Structure formats: C-alpha cells, structure tokens
A protein has these predicted regions:
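Bacterial N-terminal signal peptides that target proteins for export
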Residues: 1-12
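Bacterial N-terminal signal peptides
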Residues: 10-22
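Accessory terminal helices/loops
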Residues: 26-27, 140, 157-161, 166-180, ...
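Metallo-beta-lactamase
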Residues: 32-34, 39, 68-70, 76-78, 137-287
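Conserved beta-strand hairpin/beta-sheet module of binuclear metal-dependent hydrolase folds
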Residues: 38-87, 222-234
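Divalent metal-coordination and catalytic microenvironments
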Residues: 43, 63, 73, 88, ...
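Active-site metal-binding motif and surrounding structural segment of the metallo-beta-lactamase
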Residues: 67-68, 79-123, 262-265
C-alpha cells in the first residue's frame, strides 16, 4: 500500500510540470468565456473573440518562440487579458515576456496593463503617441457614454426579431459591459518599445517578424508574421465577414498594404475581428475597399448629396457581414469626405 501511495505521489508531482496541452491533447485547449482558442500550428494559437457577450472584443494571439512567449493584441479588457496571460503560461510553460500591439485602438491595447512591467510591449511610435494623447480623455468620456450606450443596445436587442441581428447586438452589449467593468482598474500602458522598420525576434523554435506597414487602418499599423508557419497576425488591417472600421487611416494606402501582404500568400491570416482567414480573405477586403470607393465616387460624379450617399444600400455580397453600423460610417464620414477633399484640392 505504501509503495502504491509513493508511485501515485510521484505521478502527481510530475504532472505539475507538464503543460496542460500535453496532458489532454491539443484539442483540449484552456477555456475562457471571453474568447475561443484555436491552434494554428504547434505553439501558435489564435484567441478569437467570443461574440456571446465576451470581453475580448478583438482577436489576439499566443506564440511560443521556444525560449520566450509572445502575446499579440491583449484585448480591450484587463479581465479578458488576465485569462490570455494565464492560458499562455499554461500552453507554453513560461511567463509572457513580449506583447505586440498591431495598432493604437483601445480594443487591442487596454489589456497591456496586465503584462506590465514583466513583459516588454512593442508597437509603432504612433501607437504610443496616440495612447498617451487619448487614453485618459477617452476613458473619462466613456464613463459617461458607455452606460447609456449599453442601455440602448440592450433595448435594441430586446426589440430585434432577426436572430443574427440579436447575436450582433449581444456582442455590442459585451463591448460596453467590458468597458464599464474595466473603468475602476484602467491605467495607461503604451508600448515601451517602438519600431519604425522591420524587426525580427529569433527564438529557439521559430522567429516572429514585426513589419510596420504605415498608414492603413490607422496612421501606423504593423503585422506579426511567422514565416516558418505561413501565418500572419494582421490586426485591423484585416476584417473577415465584418465591415472594417475606416476612420483614421487611408483606403488607398490600406489597399496597397493588403496587396503587398497578399504576395506573402499566408496559409493563415488572423484578422483583428471575425473568424480566422487566409490569403483569399485579404483579397475579399481589397475588393470591399474598391467596391465602396467606386460606389461613392460614382455618386459624387452624379451630384448625389451627402445625405443620399449615406442611405446607399449595402452591396449584396456584404449584406450578411457584421458591424453593419460601420458601413454608413465608411461611406459617409470616411470615403465621401476623402473623395470630396481630394476633388477640392485638385
């Protein structure tokens, strides 16, 4: 009996030092109510936002370089980021030492604070400047607006009759709930390392290539490329089955950036929002930018006024995409304004 007890104790002791994915197989990944982990390659995981009320909002990533652990875009909520940190440590067997911000937007960066000061945070100079300039101002504004917005979305969700619409509205409820829940603990945590040129971080298992892409979705974006795995984490340069948010970048430059990234022919392209995509997903977004740009320009040539352009129906191929509220913003407040400003300049 004593021998059996010693054997059992030895087994339990050894299990403490084996990462959970080796115990249960790669299909048994850690769970979070805020996101769903998807294994993309050995040691590479996408953390895809859970639309059913999760607090992640954007998609993130975990990359095991072999001798260090990297997190990409640690969400809008410190609560969701804590799950990501815990799961990264479980899956790789070590603490997180690097965090990558693909751009400045709060849904990709407010989780930074969970990893500070133990991990270095890498982003572009503009990401750092934007966070330093806007963080506290945005938080103070949202303390007033988010509770009202949450009530509005809850009301619209109750009134909705279409199931897909209800699902999307529930996602937006989660967005505002995540903000409200995080207000008491938020602290500004911008990147402490900024890069303006390609940076390769070499690990014992794989390298990760960080590529600043200039103006696109924002005034400075970057992608995280794993050449050995043919995987790219694209941040909000890529939306899949979602209307992209256009509001701080430039559609022509965005399109050129996507065309360059498509030349890499990634087998897997992780978007900032939506399900995991591939090279074809990049081409779909290029076509979206072209379609909306041409549509708005054609209406301007006809003399259609701004209000009428904002009422243009969503093209058939994009009718089932989520983030439908961005469509009106994209056509009216972004593409229209850019086109008319260019015409006036010419």
């Amino acid at each position: 009996m004593q021998t059996k007890s010693l054997k059992l104790s030895s087994i339990l002791f050894l299990l403490l030092f084996i990462p959970i994915n080796y115990l249960f197989g790669q299909s048994e990944l850690p769970k979070s109510k805020h996101y769903n982990l998807e294994k993309l390659a050995d040691g590479v995981y996408a953390a895809i936002h859970n639309d059913d009320g999760g607090f992640a909002i954007c998609n993130g990533g975990i990359v095991n370089l072999g001798d260090r652990t990297v997190i990409i875009d640690p969400f809008i909520s410190p609560t969701a980021a804590r799950d990501l940190k815990k799961h990264a440590e479980i899956l790789t067997g070590r603490p997180v030492s690097l965090v990558i911000n693909t751009h400045c937007h709060d849904d990709h960066t407010r989780g930074n604070q969970v990893f500070d000061p133990d991990a270095n945070i890498i982003g572009t100079p503009d990401a750092r400047r934007s966070i330093e300039r806007d963080f506290y101002k945005a938080v103070e504004s949202e303390k007033e607006s988010s509770p009202k917005e949450l009530l509005n979305f809850q009301k619209w969700m109750e009134q909705a009759t279409d199931e897909e619409e209800k699902k999307e509205l529930k996602m937006w409820c989660g967005y505002h709930q995540a903000k409200i829940e995080s207000f008491p603990e938020l602290k500004m945590t911008p990147p402490n390392i900024t890069i303006t040129d390609t940076m390769t971080i070499w690990g014992t298992k794989r390298e990760i290539v960080l590529i600043p892409t200039g103006i696109g979705h924002t005034t400075e974006d970057l992608i995280a490329y794993l050449p050995a795995d043919s995987i790219i984490f694209m941040g909000d340069l890529l939306f899949v089955e979602r209307h992209p948010f256009m509001g701080g970048g430039d559609p022509a430059s965005w399109k050129k950036t996507l065309q360059k990234i498509a030349l890499l022919k990634p087998k897997i392209a992780v978007p900032g929002h939506g399900p995991v995509g591939d090279t074809n997903s990049i081409h779909v977004l290029i076509k979206y930018i072209d379609t909306l740009t041409e549509m708005v320009n054609e209406e301007i040539k006809k003399g259609t006024n701004k209000d009428k352009i904002s009422e243009l129906p969503v093209p058939e191929e994009y009718k089932n995409w989520w983030f439908s509220g961005f469509y009106k913003w994209n056509t009216l407040n972004f593409l229209y304004n850019i086109a008319t400003a260019k015409a006036n300049k010419d």
